[in-house]
Amino acid sequence: YTIPAEIVYPKYFHKRGMFAAARTGDDENPERASSATQFYIVTGKFFTEMELDKMEKEQGITFTPKQRQAYMLEGGTPHLDGKYTIFGEVVSGMKAVDKIQFTETNADDRPVKNIKIKSMKIVNK
C-alpha cells in the first residue's frame, strides 16, 4: 500500500530532525509514491559552504539561504531533497533520535530490537 507523493521542495527539505516517508527506488516507482507504514528521521551530517557550493555545481541545484544555514548549522541529507515526501519535524527530543540512530541493526538495516515511540504530540505551525 502506498500513498501519492507530496513533495513540497524547497519549502520542506532534509535538515536534521525532519520526518520523511520511505519509498522504493525511482526505477520501480517513478511517481515517488510513499510507503504508508515506513518513515525515517533525518540525522545526516554538517556541511561546509564549499561542500554545498560543490553540490550545486555538480548536481545543477540551488540551495536557498535557509537550506544553506540549516545544512551548515544543524546538518542533514541534502542529496535526498526533492525526492521524498517530508511530513513532520522533531521539535524536541533529538537526543532520543540520536540513540535510535546508533541502535544495533541487522543485515536488512532494521533494529535488532523493535523501537517503539511511546508518545508524541502533533504541533501545528
Feature roles, as predicted:
Residues 1-125:
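Cross-family detector of peptidyl-prolyl cis-trans isomerase
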